[in-house]
Amino acid sequence: MNMTKRDFIDTNTYTKEEIQYMIDLGIKIKESIKNGYYPPLLKNKTLGMIFEQSSTRTRTSAEAAMTELGGHAQYLAPGQIQLGGHETIEDTSQVLGRILDIIGARVERHHTVAEVGKFAKVPVVNFMSDYNHPTQELGDIITMTEHLPKGKKLSDCKIVFVGDATQVCVSTMFMATKMGMDFVQFGPKGFQIKPETLKIGQQNAKVSGGSVTITEDADEAFKDADFIYTDVWYGLYEAELSEEDRMKIFYPKYQVNAELVAKASDHVKFMHCLPATRGEEVTDEVIDSDYSIVWDEAENRKTAMRAIFVYLLNPELRKAQASQAVADKYDAEFSLMLRNAVDDQRNAD
C-alpha cells in the first residue's frame, strides 16, 4: 500500500474496513466539534478546488471542513486556471501537486479527475464526475449509520433508489454493496444501471454478502425497505431527452409520494442528495416529513469531507488499516487528545 499518496476518486478502490474507518472517523470528529473542540488535524494544509460545474453542498462543505480543522481552501473557477486547454491536464496537475496539499475536482468527464489523480503528487478527491459521486457516497453512508433501524446493522438494511441511474444512483449502489446492504434500483428500462457498471455492484455484493436488484415492480422494490433514495429525473450530463419527455417516462410511477412510501417498512427513512425538484421526483409531503433525513444528509457532506481530508493527509491513519495494533493505538491517542483538548478549553472558559 502506498502510504504517501492515496486518492478518493472511486470508492471501489477501498476496502469495506477502510470505509468503515472513515465512517467512524467522521462521526468522531463531528462529535468533537459538537462538544466545542475543533481538532487541528488539517493545520497548514491547503485544498485546491476545481469546479467545471456549479456546486452548493460540495463546495461549501469542503471549504468549511478545511477551515474547521485548521486548513485553507482555494476555489479554482473555470477560466481562471488551465486544465486541458492551453495547458495539458498533466502539466496543470503536476504544478498544482507541487503547490497544494490536496486537490478536489468536480468535472464533466470522469477521465479528467482520473488524469489529475494520475499526475498530481498529492491526494485527489473526486467531487463528482459523470460516472460517480464518492463524497456523496460517504456522507450518505454516515447518515444511514446515524439513522439505523433499532437492532439493525448496515449489512441488515435494504435501500431502494427510485428513478434514473444517475451518478448518485450508481454511487449508492457502490457504497451499499460494499457495506453488505441490499440495493434495489426501481426505475424504467432505458434508465437502469448499465450492465458493465452493474457488474461492479454485483461483485461487491458477492464479497460483502449484500445483493443487487433492478426492477420495475414497486411492490417487489419497496418490501421491507429501510431507506428510500431518489434524485432528479434529468442529470447534469444527459441531454438526450427534454424535461417534458422525461416527465412522461417517470411521472407518476417513479415519484416518491406517500402511497409509494407506504409500501416500505414502517421505520423507513427518505433520502435525497439535493437539490430536489419538488412535485416531480418527490412530493412536499415526503421531503418535509418526520421520516425525511435529507437535512442530516446534507450536513453530513461536511462530516464526510472532514473524514476524507484527514484520512488522506494523515498517513498514520492508512497505516492503521494494515495493523490492528496500530489502529487501536491511534484510536486511543486520538480519543485522549480530544478529551484533553475539550477539558483544557472548558478550564480556560
From Swiss-Prot:
SUPFAM superfamilies: Aspartate/ornithine carbamoyltransferase. GO terms for biological process: arginine biosynthetic process via ornithine; citrulline biosynthetic process; putrescine biosynthetic process from arginine via N-carbamoylputrescine. It comes from the Bacteria. InterPro entries: Asp/Orn_carbamoyltranf_P-bd, Asp/Orn_carbamoylTrfase, Asp/Orn_carbamoylTrfase_sf, Asp_carbamoyltransf_Asp/Orn-bd, Orn/put_carbamltrans, PtcA. One of its GO terms (molecular function) is amino acid binding. GO terms for cellular component: cytoplasm. Gene3D superfamilies: Aspartate/ornithine carbamoyltransferase (3.40.50.1370). Carbamoyl phosphate binds at S55, T56, R57, T58, R59, R106, H133. Pathway: Amine and polyamine biosynthesis; putrescine biosynthesis via agmatine pathway; putrescine from N-carbamoylputrescine (transferase route): step 1/1. The record marks K30, E146 as: Important for structural integrity. It catalyses: carbamoyl phosphate + putrescine = N-carbamoylputrescine + phosphate + H(+). Its EC number is 2.1.3.6. It is an enzyme of class 2 (transferase). Putrescine binds at H272, C273, L274, P275. Homotrimer. Belongs to the aspartate/ornithine carbamoyltransferase superfamily. PTCase family. Catalyzes the phosphorolysis of N-carbamoylputrescine to form carbamoyl phosphate and putrescine. Is involved in the degradation pathway of the polyamine agmatine. This is Putrescine carbamoyltransferase. It comes from Levilactobacillus brevis (Lactobacillus brevis).
